[in-house]
Design a protein with these regions (language model features):
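Histidine-centered metal-chelating micro-motifs
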Residues: 77, 81-87, 106-107
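A hydrophobic/aromatic-rich effector-binding and dimerization subdomain
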Residues: 7, 18-21, 88-153
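Amphipathic, well-ordered alpha-helical segments in soluble domains
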Residues: 51-54, 140-147, 167, 171-174
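Regular secondary-structure segments
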Residues: 56, 142-156, 201-205
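Short, Lys/Arg-enriched, Trp-marked, Pro/Gly-tolerant hinge/linker segments that flank
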Residues: 132-135, 155-164, 175-205
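Short acidic-glycine-tyrosine-enriched beta hairpin
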Residues: 66-80
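Tight coil/turn sites that cap or link beta-strands
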Residues: 38-39, 73-74, 82, 104
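Generic protein-terminus/edge-of-domain signal
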Residues: 1-70
Length: 205
């Protein structure tokens, strides 16, 4: 069992490297997932990262924590660390874009956005990891993706780190706005009970 878990964790890193347009210790910018070999598609991986992938066209089937899903155009898949991910069929015309964040970095960005709604969004996404976006929301995701990719691969500058952090924080708010058609996010009330709740949730990320 330990060997099986170790192989799952090893393959998750190897697979992400094969579809990476950019990678460092904190973030991986993903490109074509259909570059993954057929053997790897059917091998489960234990994700050791926060993952966000948008389907641009085509279809794919997959299993998340032993639950089957289909992803199509404008579907956004968000997975949290330790999700058991298994690819099924990936269409020849399947195209996607997205990124991975290390758990430590994702936690820092998550907390920096300072919204109590983050926790409600997280709980919802754990039960509903795939959400459908409209064309405008998908275009917005691609804009964030392209800007992140551009900034990460450009010549480093003094405020690059702060800029990347700000872009990812803005992305979190955009996703929360997109989720309002699915769930009613509660207004943020900054009081002692919410502060305790947020502190407790930080320990769980």
């Amino acid at each position: 069992m330990e060997k099986e878990i170790e192989l799952i964790r090893m393959s998750s890193t190897e697979i992400m490297e094969k579809v990476a347009a950019y990678k460092d210790e904190q973030i991986i910018i993903l490109n074509q997932v259909n570059k993954v070999s057929e053997t790897e598609q059917y091998s489960p991986i234990r994700a050791d990262f926060f993952l966000a992938i948008l389907c641009l066209r085509g279809k794919a089937s997959l299993s998340l924590n032993n639950n089957s899903y289909e992803i199509g155009r404008n579907d956004l898949m968000i997975c949290h660390p330790q999700t058991l991910l298994k690819h099924g069929m990936i269409g020849d015309d399947f195209e996607c874009c997205g990124f991975c964040l290390s758990p430590k970095y994702a936690k820092r960005i998550f907390v920096m956005s300072t919204s109590a709604n983050n926790w409600y969004s997280r709980l919802y996404l754990e039960q509903h990891p795939i959400i459908s976006l409209n064309d405008e929301e998908s275009q917005l995701f691609c804009q964030y993706y392209n800007l992140l990719n551009s900034k990460l691969t450009s010549t480093p500058h003094r405020h690059q780190k702060e800029l990347i952090n700000a872009l990812l924080q803005a992305f979190i708010y955009e996703i929360q706005d997109s989720m309002e058609k699915y769930i009613q996010l509660k207004p943020v009330a900054f009081n002692s009970s919410n502060n305790l709740f947020n502190a407790f949730m930080e320990l769980l990320i």
